[in-house]
Amino acid sequence: MKLTCVLIVAVLFLTACQLIAADDSRDLKRFSRRNMRDGMLNTKNTKRQCLPPLSLCNMADDDCCNDCVLFLCSYY
């Protein structure tokens, strides 16, 4: 009975730690889905042509290397 309680508390503690870590890493720009996808696609044979900042863009084509904000490529 004691072992079962200890295991339940340990699982709940580890689950809470995972949820806390997931919430903290969500807002980091260096781990965004777009950057992860670009990292997988950028090999020696694939080169991506990026639009310059403040160029017109849309969400479907995604030619901006950063983000498309209000139909304009952003800086950073």
From Swiss-Prot:
Tissue specificity field: Expressed by the venom duct.
A Gene Ontology cellular-component term: extracellular region
GO molecular function: ion channel inhibitor activity; toxin activity
Disulfide bonds: 50-65, 57-68, 64-73
Signal peptide: 1-22
Keywords assigned by UniProt, alphabetized: Cleavage on pair of basic residues, Disulfide bond, Knottin, Neurotoxin, Pyrrolidone carboxylic acid, Secreted, Signal, Toxin
Pfam family, one: Conotoxin
InterPro entries for the chain: Conotoxin
Keyword Disulfide bond: yes
Location(s), subcellular: Secreted
Keyword Secreted: yes
Residue stretch(es) of the prosequence: 23-46
Residue positions, PTM Pyrrolidone carboxylic acid: 49
Chief location: secreted
Similarity annotation: Belongs to the conotoxin O1 superfamily.
Domain remarks: The presence of a 'disulfide through disulfide knot' structurally defines this protein as a knottin.
Protein's UniProt name: Conotoxin ArMKLT2-0211
Source organism of the structure: Conus arenatus (Sand-dusted cone)
Lineage: Eukaryota, Metazoa, Spiralia, Lophotrochozoa, Mollusca
